[in-house]
Amino acid sequence: MDVFRTDRIRNVVLLGHGGSGKTTLAEAMAYLAGMTNRLGRVEDGNTVSDFDKEEIKRHFSVSTTLIPVPWDKVKVNVLDTPGYFDFVGEVEEAVSAADAAIIVVSGKAGVQVGTQKAWNLCEKYKLPRMFFVTDMDVDDVSYRKVVEDLTELYGKKIAPLHFPIREDGKFVGYVNVVKQAGRRYIDKAGKEPCDIPEYLNEYLEKYHDILMESVAETSEEFMDRYFEGDEFSVTEVSAALATNVQDASIVPVCMGSPINLRGVSNLLDDICGYFPSPDKRSCNGISQKTNEIFEANYDFAKTKSAYVWKTIVDPFLGKYSLIKVASGVIKSDDTLLNVDKGEEERLNKLYVLEGSKPIEVPELHAGDIGAIAKLASVQTGDSLAAKAAPVLYPKAVISTPYTYKRYKAVNKGDEDKIAQALAKMTSEDKTLRVVNDAANRQTLLYGMGDQHLDIVVSKLKERYKVDVELSKPKVAFRETIRKNSDVEGKHKKQSGGHGQYGHVKMRFEPSGDLETPYVFEQVVVGGAVPKNYFPAVEKGLQECVLKGPLAAYPVVGVKATLYDGSYHPVDSSEMAFKMATILAFKKGFMDASPVLLEPIVSMKVTVPDKYTGDVMGDLNKRRGRVLGMNPDHAGNTIIEADVPQLEIYGYSTTLRSMTGGSGDFSYEFARYEQAPNDIQAKEIEARASKLEAAE
């Protein structure tokens, strides 16, 4: 592939609801640009984008794919992203590397939750954007309805650039609103001028007025001319669009049928004409030599630097670090410093990726997106720069996973293989996490949803030939006491010869601090227990609080006071006093009204106002306590509640079902609280075998 200068590059991410047609659009772009000799179909599993076996099997994208599309002497780096919410991390990574977005809307389904999430992501990253409405070949699709819905949501900045011409319900051409001209399709990719059907004149006038009003609002001069009734020329309209699309004050709407290659060439023309090249966008890092802001701004004349926005780990091809060049020109024989790790890396080769196909290139200019193979120290988010001018770039903010399940190997002996495989997968997928829960002797797999975790299991089997099974995780209960007790513990074995003797009298009471296992005090007078045995008593306590007498859970919030006892000058030992303490603890704990504590999480649930009642009702069923509700800037309600961790298992799926995918939630551990009696009884019964094993 040719090397492209910065001003001839467009980095465009495809966003939208799952099933809206992003991958089909990307495939049509690649075909029209001559990159493929056949138009692949998602259903047939032969598209450039969806090459992963899971994607082919499931007929939807699960990872971001890069397709560099050459068009009119411009390279359009198309980032095709998943639409399903479980793979939002892939989307966030792609957005961090993009300079503009196409939000794809299915004409059949209309504006969906994923459409609005895509818009919000563009707002967050201040990305220029266009809408592309697909499925125009379907007879009953209403383009006007989609435009009206978008305008209702986002106001007058919505500006349709094209609308369809239909004959007998068939999509046969389109009207160019800027040029006020009709075009008829003559074959899959061709078109010719045609008259605008009379029935469409009212819509042309309507959409042209919308566009002119949008253009007029971009400057005082245009506004004055608009009110004076002046017409803007095509050149003026195009120039205004180019300026104002880039600051998102105008958001064009295009349409077509990618499966029939219709409307796709128009979209590529608009991408090249209206979207910014990287050097029109800002990109700042911190110089590690001066600690001052380094304004890279994708300037090819500045010192070379880049950031890694994604990692791909392929069992056969190896590891690829996907970079965006922030400044300068990076060449295949460069040696760059991994600024995060302080290690130098020799590049050897540079690539651009066409789906799964790496194509070697000699250099990448500022703003371009490429790949480097086998960088040992480099991870997603790392910065690369010349050693003489190290620059650190901010890392993309990736969503935190809250759905988790317990996993274990199906076949004994596979544990190490699974751990190694998951290490590779977590380097590739930043929303996948592995957590070792030592207290409950389980390993947890965190992801963005059940579908995400199911695909992880499938990939482990397909790629790494290991089987794991997922199950409901155990919750980390704790044990404490509510009352006081006064007990003694005596460990005595004297059967001739050197015996064992330890005797303690102790008081147990709540310490009031549920974050600390125990507090130990000694108030022994007169040497009833010599001071040199106090550490042995504490060792006994330390051992006891690891597994409590009630249900073998860790103990918290206990104050233990050693106030008396006795010893034998020959038979007493540290071990004897430790054993005496263990006996005292078990009796004293059970005599002090022991209870199980369950973990409580502080949860924030963000939902559209219309779902607030349903969500609150569900939280109440989960024993949640709603603490407050607050509006946000996007017409949503943020519900704050304390909920037992035991009750949030599966919440991601439930919330998605209740809100049609529009709800989000987060939580963090808050504290421990006494569990209800029925929960305690059930848990104590279930843990009886562990208590017996601890005896």
Model-derived segments and their meaning:
Residues 1-695:
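Structural and coupling elements of P-loop NTPases
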